[in-house]
Amino acid sequence: MLNPNDADDSDSSTDSSPPVAVPRPKRSATVSPSTRNSFYNSRRRSDANLNFFNERERQRERRRSMVRASRERSESRRASQQNLRKTNSEPNVDMPSIDVEALQKLLLSIPKFVSASRNRINQRHDSDSGGEMTTEIEELKDAAKSIQSLQRVLAYPSQTSSDRGGNRRLADPVESCLESSVFSDVDESSLATDTIEGRRSGISTRLGHPRGVMQFIPSIRNDQFVPTSEIRRNSISRKSSVPDGFMTSEMESEPVPNVRNRRRGIVDEMFSSSTSLLVDRPSETLAGVNRFAKLLDTFRSRPTSPEQHPSISWNPYVYSDGGEALETCGMEDSLHEADILLWKKRSRASLRRHYSVRHLAARELLDTEKSFVEGLEFLVTKYMRPLRQPLECTLIEASLVDKIFYRIPEILAHHQVLLTTLSQRIDQWHKDAILGDVLLAHFSKQSMIETYISFVDNFKFAKASIIQARQKHAFEKYYNRCCRDHPNKLDLDSLLISPIQRVPRYELIVKQMLKHTPVEHEDRERLLRAQRHIHCLAVAINQHKDGSEQMEQRLREIEAIVDGLDDLVTKDRTLLRHDIITLKGTDRERCIFMLSDLLLVTSVKKKPKVLYSKMSSQSMGFLEGNRFKLLFKVALEDVQISKDTLSQLEEVERKLESSREDDRVLKKMSQLCSLLKCERKVLMEMLETMETSNSMSIRELNEQMSSDPDLSAVHLDVLTSNGFEPFVLEFPNAEKRSVFEAMFKDAKATLAKNLLAAPSCSLKTIIAHQTRPGLQLCTATVVPGKRVDSTPSLWVCASDKFSGQVAVMALDTGEITIESCSAIGNAAVTAMCTVPPPMKLRKRKIKSQKSLEHLLNETIMDINSSGSDTESSSDEGTSTAGQTTVWIGNDDGEVFVVNSTERVRSRARDRLARLRNSITSICAANGNVLVATSYSNQVQLLLFRPASDGSWDLENPQTVGHVCQAPITSMQLIGRRVIIASGNWLHAYFVDTGKFQPPVEILPSSDVITLMYVTGQNVFLCGRKSTEVFVVDVFNLSIINHFNVVSFVRSQLSGREHILREHKMGCLRISCLTVARSHLWIGTSAGCVLSTSVQSARSQPTPDLRVCEIGHSGPCRILLPVHTPSHSNHPSRKQKRSSLNVPAQQSSQLMLVSCGEGLDDGTATQDPSTDAINHLIFWKCS
């Protein structure tokens, strides 16, 4: 009998064995929640052929098998849920069906939602109570399911720790999810903490978000999530990637505390606290990016926070003031965050290893510093100090010692302080020890930086001095002995270069310490700053080391391409710029080179077969593509701006800028006027008129900038032999003019500052040969060598009232030696002068003849504006085969003329001029020789001219008419005039015209000018037995300044015996004057030698006089500058093309010779018996 409720037997089992439970297939996380019921097995149908008697038993057995299968399926499902595999697709959610009424209660509990949504939800619920749910409820239900899925995957706890006490039951999944997601701006995708196991999911995306959640936040951006510090630590523990940037929200009710970031300063806290309540955070974050934003926008901030706080990007390098970021360092932010994450992720063992390596680096810094200081101490104690001792000072000159060990004591003092501080810190080492402040304090000191730079600048001169000193056998033996005494057998060169090599070593050690210093360590910021200072010092050292060589090479290139320019390369000379100019009144282009102490004006001519291309005058291609010829050379100290038009240029620029601003405003007003609805015709016409007028003003100002000569020209005054002459430079436009003038002023200021600095001098003393006591040094002169580049010799005369003696000293070797010493004449020597060989006129190279008056009045502008760029149109002179001679005069009226290459012998009497009166002064003047004689009130001035054969006509001197009433005591040539001192008057005599300038009375009538020295535009003089120096202008002979030296000498003698001090002060007077290297040198009867800059002596009523450490026991009688190698004294056409203070050839070295009685070094250790012996002190000025 068939049972209609039974199925057929096609699906049944034929045996009586219980059915095997089929395991439920594993569900993937990508399966939609709506398909979860499809995995339940269908009910098994019974067999249709079973009889009635077995029906009940089968049903019972079937029920038991179904219970077993259900139990097995439940166990399998739980196991599958525990081993759930996460993917990028939608996760499965095993949640019960959503209760709509519970969801409505949840929504009604929201304060903002109550007022707007309660009625709408109730109305729709009432209207749809018996039917289907509305679309909004369906959307809300889907949203709740999605949020439940998000909560499931993130496994975020649904209640805080305060709920554990039973005050609140476990929240419904929907309620907890809404509360934590809708009303929180925390990055929900990063809150993957498991409530049961307390762990994070091990799978995350590149942005730090768990996989499988991305479809819920499709518009997510990288800068909208900020994980809390707790989540950040969990992120590190599971080795996940870190977001590239974060966004923080500033809360009014709970301000974010500021913490100290050790890298850049005070910044906002990087991550918000993990203890902050989720309910206190706005719902801005998820609502703005979720696909249900339309619905969640109704859940905006609660009434307690009506305003949304602006989001501020977190930046660990920014010091925020008032909520505003002052700087952005995006790349450094990411790197700094990565550093923090990496250091926090390290284990304790790894941190211990890093701290250990950091300690080793600090120990290495200390050990290498000790070794470096020991090397410097070896230099000072074994080399420098012994070589300055009296026992060893004869090995090499003191000047070489100072040049070799320049700045070594200062460097040693700085590093001894650093070593002491490092030792104290490292001896008390711990993991939080700080060294950055020590290094920062050391390398940020300006004195230390200047010391290193000066040392590097002098380094190549120090090496050259070592080579020079090792040429002496005695020093070579001492040098080898010191090398053997050194622990590492290092020579002097290796020890001297150690300061330069030390600086990069500091940088390497500091980098090693930074590598092993945690990011949040207090020392890291200081180490970073110290590293920057060390790096800047290393770069400066390299620049100064290579810059001087590059500048020297560039000067040599300019010297090679400029025809007629020689000896341009000197120490500390640099090229500043070069420009194309035109001189006033001409249309020819000239090139002006501005150097640190010189101006060169040259002609410009393009080279043939060179394609012309428009290039900047500052480019090297411009120099290579043109030919240059020197026209004029001007010392920078001889130039001054005569007409200040820069202020006028600045005024025009201000007017032009104002007009341009007005033009922009008028155009904007016209645009706004066109929007008016009322009548605007009159206003539009007014605006058009104003705009037209303003445009014309702009055009006129632009034309004035380019065409006005006052704005594009620089008016200079150049000091020449004729006085100050105008020199107008016209530039292509006002901009280039302003740049040139600004650089010119800076160069003048720098040069004046350098001239104020006293030159460093060293000394060497020799004893002048004396045949008998009683001879006093009276006069000296410098005689050039046989060639222009050969070393000069020094001729010194000593005499008593009955005879004279001439000593010739050679300076061409390292040692100063006395070549010869011969007697000359039977009277006291009163005057001596070096006279260049006579000149003969050569033929003129142009057809037109110029009058003598025109040649005398020829100015710089005339020379540079001439039509020819080849040869000068004036009379030029060339030397004959004659030799340089030395003229020596005595009280008997005899003038001895001696060749510079001959020894002083009795046959010198063959060339002798016998005059009536005693000789008082001799001066060489433009190819002639002036000799002054006097007897009682008879004053005579004689002019000796060269003969036709090139010799001197000593038999027929020409008498020069004059108005001098007193004996002529001194004559000095400057330019085209000779300054003559007669009594208390100064006279100026023009050799070319034979005319005198009106004399000027300088001293009182009771005094007489006995000493005079002329340099540039200054005349320094003083009276007989006077301690006051007068400064007179060389052109108008007016007194500029005067000062006294008594106070400086008294201060120098303050430590001497009372009797000696009173004796020297009682008879104190100025005994000699000279000028060398822009410094005035003053010798006194007390034996003291003083010096000051010419600029100070000219401008200051009490200049800062520097007293030399070593002087003479008796009076200092002669001060004489000696240039080595000396330049020829022959007048040449180049001297006519130079300013007053430009020498014909730059000297490589300057020596100042001080001649006097005895030697006084301030130690009172000299033998008193040598106080009356003549000594010569050679000061070598660098």
UniProtKB/Swiss-Prot annotation:
PANTHER family: RHO GUANINE NUCLEOTIDE EXCHANGE FACTOR, RHO GUANINE NUCLEOTIDE EXCHANGE FACTOR 17. One of its GO terms (cellular component) is cytoplasm. This is Rho guanine nucleotide exchange factor osg-1. Keywords: Coiled coil, Guanine-nucleotide releasing factor. SUPFAM superfamilies: DBL homology domain (DH-domain) (SSF48065), Quinoprotein alcohol dehydrogenase-like (SSF50998). Residues 637-669, 897-922 form a coiled coil. Residues 1-12 have a biased composition (Acidic residues). Residues 29-41 have a biased composition (Polar residues). One of its GO terms (molecular function) is guanyl-nucleotide exchange factor activity. The gene is osg-1. Probable guanine nucleotide exchange factor which regulates the Rho GTPase rho-1. Functions in ASE sensory neurons where it promotes neuronal degeneration under conditions of oxidative stress. Expressed in muscles in the body wall and head, and in the nervous system in neurons including FLP and ASE neurons in the head. The lineage of its organism: Eukaryota, Metazoa, Ecdysozoa, Nematoda, Chromadorea. One of its GO terms (biological process) is intracellular signal transduction. PROSITE patterns: DH_1, DH_2. Residues 865-879 have a biased composition (Low complexity). Residues 1-96, 863-884 are annotated as: Disordered. Disruption phenotype: Viable with normal development, size and lifespan. Reduced sensitivity to factors that induce neurodegeneration. Improved chemosensory response in aging worms. Residues 357-544 form the DH domain. Residues 69-78 have a biased composition (Basic and acidic residues). Pfam families: PH_19, RhoGEF, WD40_2.
